[in-house]
Amino acid sequence: MGLIAPWCLALCLLIIAATARAEMVANLYDAAVPVKEQTQSTFRRAASEGLERVLIRVSGRSQVSDRADIASALANPEPLVVQYRYHQPLAPDNDPSAVDESPSLMLELSYSPRQVNALLQSAGLPVWSANRPSMLVWLVADTASGRRFVGGGEQPELQALMNDEALRRGLPLQLPLFDLTDTANLSVNQVWQLSAPAVREASQRYGSAYILVGRASEFSTGQWVASWLLLDGDVVRTFESDGMGARQALASAVDRVADVQAERYAVLNGGAGAGSSLIQIDGIADFRSYAALMGYLESLAIVRHANSVWVSDRELVVDLVLNDDMEKAQRFLAMDGRLQEVSGNGQQGSPSGVPPQLMVRNRYRWVGAAR
């Protein structure tokens, strides 16, 4: 019980200091737009295009410009730009067309996270933080050269397109190693058949929250058609995509995954279930553990404030003031495993040792500041 007094004395300082945010997705508020010249009108058009990309990435919505507040900001994007620079991209040495064409400039822009988030909230749109679940992709493409995996040195052009589209929507993309273990665990044919059991078993070593399984076919007309499985825990979603060119087919699939994830994790400020909830947390061994825990909770986009209301030797009760509902908060807490659920979750009441007036809703164990 000797730890209670210093914890209480340091509480206010901890809440102020606990501002570090662990990001899974870098450059969420940045965009790069090709331009031909450095005029003011060109800058405004490019800044508007870049801002729309950022708004789509941060909101998790594929369409944002239909909101009046967003349309107004896109017409006058300069106030949201905090930094920009022009640079000359190098043309490939083996690209003969680059000799005849005027080389484009690339305008790199950074936008204010605070202003972007405020704009989305004023437009009634959610904000999806940089802490996002990873997605493992097993993709087989059937082209003129046969059916092959995408990745591991195979079909690099398709891998680059997949990376580009994941970056566009802010999805942390993971490709298999395609080492001897993967070769033994999963075949091209099993992926082509969209065998969920085989894919699940082969994917266990990677620990990704989502697994995307796809088979894509290229036709002589340039048309691409693809079938997909999205494995989300025990949930299996199936869908199709197509397009004139591989990029369209892959973009459609990435959009589908991003929409599913954003529905679960993007936070709508002041949502119907917003409020506060008491959670009990054990495994707090010392002051450092306490500081790490409170910093972590304060860093979550869904948490407006995290306030300690009761502290014991190795456990405490925290009042979470939420921007959205507790169900979504539970998804955030489960995403990286720093807080693990313990038995009895969802049963309102006061656990042994906790004052009876504190109606704890969920119970967790703190397992560390990083995993």
Regions found by a protein language model. Give the residues of each.
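N-terminal segment of the mature soluble domain
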Residues: 47-73, 133, 137-144, 148-192, ...
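Bacterial N-terminal signal peptides that target proteins for export
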Residues: 1-8
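Acidic, glycine-rich low-complexity/disordered segments
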Residues: 132, 140-149, 241-244, 252-285
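Signal peptide-directed extracytoplasmic domains
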Residues: 63, 67-139, 151-152
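A short, hydrophobic beta-strand-centered structural micro-motif
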Residues: 81-90, 174-177, 191-222, 310, ...
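N-terminal signal peptide c-region/cleavage motif recognized by signal peptidases
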Residues: 17-19
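Amphipathic beta-strand/beta-sheet edge segments enriched in Tyr/Trp
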Residues: 25-32, 36, 203-251, 326-330, ...
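C-terminal soluble interaction/assembly domains
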Residues: 239-246, 265, 275-371
